[in-house]
């Protein structure tokens, strides 16, 4: 693979699926604030004029689901019927039930350290030294473009922007190293009064140029800004949204494998979420320690069982020390049982709403992004 292209995409906080993710995680956070041991599996569906919140929740906490939903939509920016969705007037339906006692008996144990996994499943974590946050560049810059779209929309720089947007960036690689950006796609919802030429110029100057490094842009880079020419109808009016439908956007943009489990709305007893975070933490510390340039971790679990049923480490031939040393380091320095990883990453806190837009990884404010084990790993591996 001497020369190749690789593409990832992202979506904004106003994309219908991301509205759903943020509502689900807002509910989770509100419950964890009162009851850190709650069991939460919250799903959301949004469509024109309506939000349905459902799932299984077992908790001693009380949360005003309707007001929380409206506040979340309001923060995103859907506050007027002209946008096709209005936080103040949309219907909010609540269909939440309790978690099955059959699941509880496998998860809850007398000794917390023996807490079983909330379900079976496989989870992947990944890191590479392509960017300063040890994430693949295509997904990193796709996120940054739609983050910038939200910033200039909310601060009034481009007041005619609306909340729904998508980005996509294609990078050129040679011998596994970035040599440039081949293509950029950015589609953004807008009000009816802005012309397409004015929109394209403003998006280029205020969003794309400030975000993408100039050294990766050339005369051959292709830019596609609102390529259909018009994007007035968007958000839940354009498409329905569902929790958990942007799992590749949430993770590595397709640069690493995915176990299939979504994150948003799930408390940390659900290993779909917590073990994926732990796998990222392990992979990132291995790369930060200089043990490998790229690292992918796979974990698997059985419902009600504490220890992972398997741990896989893949370094794609980039390892700087023997594979056996890396595997032994993972076993020695990372507790990957459900209780252990919750404690290791301090997951029983209300930090999840922020994760629900612009990616769960590569953002230093989250505990699974810490590289606090890198020094231990270096010492263990004898890396100077």
Curated annotation (Swiss-Prot):
Which PROSITE patterns does the record cross-reference, listed alphabetically? ADOMET_SYNTHASE_1 (PS00376), ADOMET_SYNTHASE_2 (PS00377)
Q: Which residues bind ATP?
A: 15, 164-166, 230-231, 239, 245-246, 262, 266
Signal sequence, renumbered to the chain: none
Q: What is its EC number?
A: 2.5.1.6
Which residues make up the binding site for L-methionine?
Answer: 56, 99, 239, 270
Q: Could you list the residue ranges that cross the membrane?
A: none
**Which locations, inside or outside the cell, does it occupy?**
Cytoplasm
Top enzyme category = transferase
> What InterPro entries does this protein map onto?
ADOMET_SYNTHASE_CS (IPR022631), S-AdoMet_synt_C (IPR022630), S-AdoMet_synt_central (IPR022629), S-AdoMet_synt_N (IPR022628), S-AdoMet_synthetase (IPR002133), S-AdoMet_synthetase_sfam (IPR022636)
Name the source's superkingdom: Bacteria
Where do the annotations place Mg(2+) binding? 17
Q: Which GO terms describe its cellular component?
A: cytoplasm
- Which cofactors does the annotated protein need, by name? Mg(2+); K(+)
Where along this sequence does the record place binding of K(+)?
A: 43
Functionally, this protein is described as follows: Catalyzes the formation of S-adenosylmethionine (AdoMet) from methionine and ATP. The overall synthetic reaction is composed of two sequential steps, AdoMet formation and the subsequent tripolyphosphate hydrolysis which occurs prior to release of AdoMet from the enzyme.
The cross-references to HAMAP family, in alphabetical order and at most eight, read:
S_AdoMet_synth1
Assigned protein family: Belongs to the AdoMet synthase family.
Q: Which protein, by its recorded name, is this?
A: S-adenosylmethionine synthase
Specify the species: Vibrio parahaemolyticus serotype O3:K6 (strain RIMD 2210633)
Source organism phylogeny: Bacteria, Pseudomonadati, Pseudomonadota, Gammaproteobacteria, Vibrionales
């Amino acid at each position: 693979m001497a020369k190749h292209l690789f593409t990832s995409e992202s979506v904004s906080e106003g994309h219908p699926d991301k509205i759903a993710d943020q509502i689900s995680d807002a509910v989770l956070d509100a419950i964890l604030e009162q009851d850190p041991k709650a069991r939460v599996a919250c799903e959301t569906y949004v469509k024109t004029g309506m939000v349905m919140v459902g799932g299984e929740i077992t908790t001693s906490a009380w949360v005003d689901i309707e007001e929380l939903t409206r506040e979340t939509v309001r923060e995103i920016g859907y506050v007027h019927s002209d946008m096709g969705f209005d936080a103040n007037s949309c219907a909010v339906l609540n269909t939440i039930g309790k978690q099955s006692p059959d699941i509880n008996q496998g998860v809850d144990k007398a000794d917390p350290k023996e807490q079983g996994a909330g379900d079976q499943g496989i989870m992947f974590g990944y890191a590479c030294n392509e960017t300063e946050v040890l994430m693949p560049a295509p997904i990193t810059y796709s996120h940054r473009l739609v983050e910038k779209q939200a910033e200039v929309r909310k601060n009034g720089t481009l007041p005619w922007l609306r909340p729904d947007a998508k980005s996509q960036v294609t990078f050129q690689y040679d011998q596994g190293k970035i040599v440039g950006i081949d293509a950029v796609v950015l589609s953004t919802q807008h009000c009816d009064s802005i012309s397409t030429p004015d929109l394209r110029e403003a998006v280029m100057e205020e969003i794309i140029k400030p975000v993408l490094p100039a050294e990766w842009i050339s005369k051959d880079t292709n830019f596609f800004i609102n390529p259909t020419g018009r994007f007035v109808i968007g958000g839940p009016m354009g498409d329905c949204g569902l929790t958990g439908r942007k799992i590749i956007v949430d993770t590595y943009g397709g640069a690493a494998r995915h176990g299939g489990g979504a994150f948003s709305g799930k408390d940390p007893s659900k290993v779909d979420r917590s073990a994926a975070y732990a796998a990222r933490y392990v992979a990132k510390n291995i790369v930060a320690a200089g043990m490998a340039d790229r690292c992918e971790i796979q974990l698997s679990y059985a419902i009600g069982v504490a220890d992972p049923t398997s741990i896989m480490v893949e370094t794609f031939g980039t390892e700087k020390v023997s594979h056996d040393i890396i595997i032994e380091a993972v076993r020695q320095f990372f507790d990957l049982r459900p209780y252990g990883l919750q404690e290791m990453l301090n997951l029983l806190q209300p930090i999840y709403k922020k994760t629900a837009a612009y990616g769960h990884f590569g953002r230093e404010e989250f505990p699974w992004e810490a590289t606090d084990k890198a020094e231990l790993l270096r010492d263990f591996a004898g890396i100077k």
